[in-house]
């Protein structure tokens, strides 16, 4: 059984429209957003409304069931993006959600999926395990002021555009950018992402180079106050689209994780570390806060397997 851990009011207009993820009365387990806090899920047993419990296939490993929640975010982002088969995609952030956004884009027929992260190991993993087609390691640069920060974002966008895709051509401009970091520089680069754009390009050059009508999906949650080049988006109708949690995604997620196609991403590889018993919860959270473990292995998705009750 996989729990959809948000419990909406089921009475408001948003719930009636199927957009219960933005229900004002939502109570979300393990979240401190609302008060009084709802019970968390790190318990041996828990009572949860049957409506939000989803039965897993008998042959599905529990680790895959644990991916349904982040996969739900990816599916919700995909649906809001309007991505269609044959389009090109850029994903900023190669954590669990970013990898799953890339995976969904590939499964849904994206022509090229580029994944970008500051961690070279993560983007290499993404390509090796078939989550993405092309990897890009984002340089660790920070601007000392707004102008320098925007210049770095344009430079990053230009470098992405010069990458070589599976057909041996330049990636160029992309149709949809899934921004899964919440980092200001990545949101800026997502707006700018273009083909053959030099780091000293003018605002006019940018408006001519970036895909008109493209979308930047705001999946990651970072600093709530950010400086963005809105003119670069507005004058070419590049949409900035918010993504908050998920709604009506678990059944499709189960279908995706149940697929056996050889070209699909290796979803099991996403679960890199396992801990047994609630006594190890602190160790599990400490591991989840790392990018690599003591042996130098990547840390992506960490799961806690509770001991069965007697």
Label each region the model flagged:
Residues 79-84, 107, 169-170, 208:
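Glycine-rich helix-loop-beta junction characteristic of Rossmann-like nucleotide cofactor-binding loops
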Residues 188-191, 198-207, 247, 251-310:
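C-terminal hydrophobic helical "lid"/dimerization subdomain
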Residues 36-42, 58-80, 92-100:
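A glycine-rich, Thr/Ser-enriched phosphate-binding loop motif common to dinucleotide/cofactor-binding enzymes
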Residues 91-94, 106-192:
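Adenosine-nucleotide cofactor-binding segment
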